[in-house]
Amino acid sequence: MKITIEYSAQIRRTLGVSEETIDLMDSQSLHDLILHLAEKHGQLFKDLILDAEGNLSRMILASVNSVQVQESTSVDLKDGDCVNLMSPISGG
């Protein structure tokens, strides 16, 4: 199944891309996708999006098809889904 991932803010700057499409096996969760992306993009990306337990960091906002996700392990992905990963913008 094909999943489109959109990156915003610091994640986009870290990767140097704003979007990519990934082919996954059927029956994958958002958490599975995040682990796949962490392995694909290396340690800097992994440190940015994962916490010490290997879960999505609380500092990263995730949405699937424009609906914000609170727990990445509870969301099953479907062919054609669009996932957005972003770090909140802060400062003053």
Question: What does each model-identified segment do?
Answer:
Residues 1-91:
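Ubiquitin-like/PB1-type beta-grasp interaction modules and other compact soluble beta-rich domains
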